Each structure stands twice: as C-alpha cells, then as structure tokens.
C-alpha cells in the first residue's frame, strides 16, 4: 500500500505542477501588463482601446496586417576613470511605430512623441498602402502570456547613486590590488529599462518589460616603457545586485590577466615562409586566402568566364 500511495502522490504532483506553473506565469503576465499599461499607456493619456480604434481606422483599407508598437526607454550610465566618476547621464526616450502590410508592400510610420494624435496621424499615413472601401471593425483587445524569461524590476532603481559609484570604485580597488603593474582603471556601468506594448489588427495585444545592465572594465598595465590594455565585463537582463562581489572579481581578474598577457606578447611571425597544407579542409583555406584574390584579378582584367 505504501508503494501505491507514493505512486499516487507522484502522479498527482505531475498533474498539479503544470497548473501551478501556468498560474505563476499568469500572475507575472498580469503584473507586467498592469505596469506597462500604467507607466507607458496611461501616463501618456492612452489605453488599449485607443490603439484598437487606430488599428480599426487602418482596417478600413485593404491591408493584410497592421500593428502598433509603443516603447519607452529609460537609460542611465556612469563612467569612472583615474579614480573619479568623470561622466554620468540619464535619459528617457519614447515613441510609437505603426506598420501596415498589403500584399508584398509594407508601410511604416513613426513618431518620437507618444500620444493619441501621433498614433492617429501615423495610422492615417500607413493605411494608404491599401485601397479604401472596407467596413471598420473595432476588435476587443485580448492579451496572451508566455513563459517569463527574465525579471522585470527596474535596475535603475535597484541601487542608489552612492552604491553605483561605490561599485565602480570597488572595481578600481580590485584591479590595482591584483598586480602593481596596473596603472589605470576605467569602469562603466549602464542600466536600461524598456516598457513595450504591441497591438495588432487581429485584436491581439502584448506587453513586455525588458531590464538590461552591463558592467564594462578596461585596465592598462605598464612594464618599463610598454603599456598594454585588457578588458572584460558582462551583464544581462537583471537588476544591479546581480553584480556580486564574486562576479565583479571575476571580471576584474579577466581584464587584468588579459593586460598582463599582452605585456608578454611577441609579434607574430610575418613575411615569406613555407606553408604545408594537408588534404581536405586546408584546401578551403587556400581557396579563401588566394582563390578570391585571383577571381578578383580575372574580373578586373575581364578575363573571367
């Protein structure tokens, strides 16, 4: 009985787990949708129904497909050099793009402003790709959700300015402590936060939030009169706490190692030399290295068949 009971529990678990996963994706989708509708659409006096009405106006012409793409991007960057933060910037860009397809023809229109008037005028511009004469239909917006592949927190707000500057100073400290030959450190930290809303002619709507962070490190090593550079870094769709002390140390060590290796590097052999190629793929190398040049000469001299 014990074995049977355990089997039943496993079977029930296999049935319930997909439902739990689906519910989790549904909740994340709802959170994303609400955030994008509030901070992208409503903040600019728009609603999903407004986009559907503009698409309906496009649909009065003979078009096969149309969509409206709304986007807002917030970007922040910090740059450290010579022990101090020498530059920092913050900007917000937003706009809308409208597309219509009729047969093999595609029309685009876009605006740097995001409001009902710019969307209406863009829709009127692209719909001329198709002939007029269809009856207008306003489709009720319906959203679909898929698997969440990254988190949606705003990385710009995940650390305050002092913590971001401290992270860059930490990079410099680690690099100079790694080897006394490191004489200069340059580090950059960038954060991006995209809000996206897409509406299609068939009534399908979709929302997405795309965070992006990157830490870039460049070091200069000096030995005698020779100076060499090394660089490393990384990032992804995370918030800034992703850059743990362990990960930052790995980036720094990679940049330092590259610079120190370059200090010991010698020029590669150059000039005329004998090269022996075996059969098979080396023949391809020979063709790429020599054959294309010969083909070009033949074409230039108009002697090619």
Where are these regions (language model features)?
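Acidic, Ala/Val/Gly-enriched low-complexity intrinsically disordered segments
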Residues: 2-6, 11-12, 22
């Amino acid at each position: 009985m014990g074995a049977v009971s355990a089997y039943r529990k496993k079977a029930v678990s296999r049935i319930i787990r997909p439902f739990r996963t689906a519910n989790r994706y549904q909740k994340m989708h709802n959170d994303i949708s609400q955030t994008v509708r509030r901070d992208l659409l409503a903040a600019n006096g728009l609603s999903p129904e407004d986009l559907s009405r503009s698409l309906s106006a496009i649909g009065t012409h003979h078009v096969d497909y149309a969509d409206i793409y709304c986007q807002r991007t917030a970007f922040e960057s910090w740059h450290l050099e010579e022990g101090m933060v020498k530059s920092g910037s913050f900007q917000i860009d937003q706009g809308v793009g409208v597309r219509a397809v009729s047969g093999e023809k595609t029309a685009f229109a876009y605006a740097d402003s995001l409001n009902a008037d710019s969307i209406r005028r863009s829709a009127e511009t692209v719909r001329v790709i198709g002939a007029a004469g269809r009856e207008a239909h306003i489709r009720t917006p319906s959203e679909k959700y898929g698997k969440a592949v990254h988190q949606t927190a705003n990385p710009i707000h995940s650390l305050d300015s002092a913590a971001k500057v401290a992270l860059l100073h930490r990079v410099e400290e680690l690099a100079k402590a790694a080897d006394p030959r490191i004489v200069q450190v340059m580090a950059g930290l960038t954060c991006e936060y995209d809000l996206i809303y897409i509406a299609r002619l068939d009534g399908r709507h979709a929302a997405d939030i795309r965070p992006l962070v990157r830490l870039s490190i460049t070091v200069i090593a000096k030995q005698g009169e020779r100076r060499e550079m090394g660089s490393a870094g990384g990032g992804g769709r995370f918030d800034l706490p992703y850059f743990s002390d362990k990960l930052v140390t790995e980036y720094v060590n990679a940049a330092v190692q590259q610079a120190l290796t370059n200090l010991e590097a010698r020029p590669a052999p150059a000039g005329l030399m004998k090269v022996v190629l075996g059969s098979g793929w080396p023949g391809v190398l020979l063709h790429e290295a020599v054959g294309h040049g010969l083909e070009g000469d033949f074409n230039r001299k108009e002697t090619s068949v």
